[in-house]
Amino acid sequence: KAIRRQRQMCIRDRFKNYSKLVLNNQESLWEIAFEPNNGQKDNAGYWATYNGPLVDAPDAGSGAANQTHMGRANAFFIVLPYWGHFYEDNDVRRDVNFVDYVYRWVKKDQDQVKMTVCQEISKNMYRYPGKWRREWMAPGFVDPNHTGVNYCPLRYADVVLMAAEAYNETGNTPEAWRLLNSVRTRSEATAITSANYASLMKAPKVYDLPFISDGDEAGKFRTALYWERAFETAYEGQRKFDLIRWGILGDALRAAQAYIENWEEGAAEFKDVDKNGKPTKLEDGATPAVWDPVVWATQNYVAGHNFVDGKHELLPIPLAEIQSNAQLNGENNPGYE
């Protein structure tokens, strides 16, 4: 029924509505509610603080009124900078899903000032999830760390892509493509066809997926769905469960790891970062910019190298639960025996 009611709402407006506390908006099929109480701790959440662009709280000694400024966003989650290059330039989801700026408290201005070139961004080429933002909320807060923004675990586009996947796996791949492309085109991305499939879904636009065979039309759809669910539901808590459901979590982590370790950033985008990843141009612009292209990832990421297939898809069951639940027969999840 939801699929028959295609919603044509700009993705920026859809996620602005969440931040503005517009409850059960057109995109939502189910929301987990938090108290819209200006960020008081009781029954509040962390959407747009943990997973939004960085925002400094007003200086406590400045006399700035909380009711005229944004609350703090701690920005504990960052985005790998190459991810934005996988989107088409015309895909409006790209600039909604992640941002490259912060709001710093500037004492002389007595205000939170938007900065796109600052140490916090440049030193690690930080990018932040952008679907939930303090700047989209009404000014004012009580507790700087909390918001009343609801979490939507099930929304329209997610269901359309679920239906598309089901059609493909039951032999109706043309209908699967129609539904997947309806999600793409409502965000102004190009519909995938046999003529443009390789240019949109294969290297060098994205990296290739050797663990998904795309020798037939159903396989091409699975490859497209791999990327499309990532583009559409980025940072919504869906990805791990998609990869587990498809049986490719380990493969996907290793493929991403290999790409990270061999990716060279473009001079135009990271001209203010030296070969060690340190900023050469700070907020005041006093230090001249010197750029030397290097491989961005210089450290091993645990998930990419240490993931064990058949084990790490699940967490271990705590011993106390095994001992107290006779139905478990003393058994733990695979790999934790």
List the model feature ranges, each with a label.
Residues 38-68, 78, 205, 236:
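Acidic-aromatic pocket-rim loops
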Residues 51-52, 79-80, 193, 318:
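Alpha-helix initiation/capping motif
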Residues 1-43, 89-337:
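Acidic/polar-rich alpha-helix caps and helix-coil junctions
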